[in-house]
């Protein structure tokens, strides 16, 4: 009887470990298309240095029928005591329906006037 209970416990632990949700796909290379399933999140990670006033923004309109913006976070990758140290801008999106679209981000200088971005990067997103 103890062996059966132990076996049931081990199988339950194994199944619980397998049932977890897969982590969001993390992408840094715009040359590689992002392929995700419907309802899944993915992140685009870009080098950034907001301490200098530069910042990333979504350019144009997202195709809300295919992907939606979820959130934007920043993580420092430099010594916290270093003024002007950079880090990573982490953009999270969620796929909504099957389709293909593009997400374009622009890196803008510090300014109150509308200006062209210093850099742009475009990611192709394929939702299956």
Protein language model annotation of sequence segments:
Residues 1-4:
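Positively charged n-region of N-terminal signal peptides that target proteins for export
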Residues 93-103:
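Glycine-centered tight-turn and secondary-structure capping sites
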Residues 125-127:
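Interdomain boundary/hinge segments at the C-termini of tandem beta-sandwich modules
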Residues 52, 60-78:
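Short, solvent-exposed loop/linker segments at beta-strand-coil boundaries, enriched for Pro/Gly
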Residues 83-90:
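Aromatic sugar-binding surface patches on proteins
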Residues 111-119:
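Beta-sandwich strand segments
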Residues 21-44, 49:
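N-terminal edge beta-strand
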Residues 15-17:
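C-terminal motif of bacterial Sec signal peptides marking the signal peptidase cleavage site
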């Amino acid at each position: 009887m103890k062996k059966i209970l132990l076996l049931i416990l081990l199988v339950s632990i194994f199944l619980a470990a397998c049932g977890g949700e897969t982590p969001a796909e993390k992408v840094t290379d715009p040359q590689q298309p992002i392929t995700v399933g419907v309802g899944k999140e993915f992140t685009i990670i870009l080098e950034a240095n907001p301490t200098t006033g530069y910042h990333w923004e979504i350019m144009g309109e997202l195709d809300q029928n295919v992907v939606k913006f979820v959130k934007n976070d920043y993580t420092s990758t430099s010594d916290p005591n270093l003024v002007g140290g950079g880090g990573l801008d982490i953009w999270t999106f969620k796929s909504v329906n099957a389709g293909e679209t593009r997400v374009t981000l622009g890196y803008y200088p510090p300014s109150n006037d509308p200006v062209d971005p210093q850099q742009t990067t475009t990611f192709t997103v394929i939702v299956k």
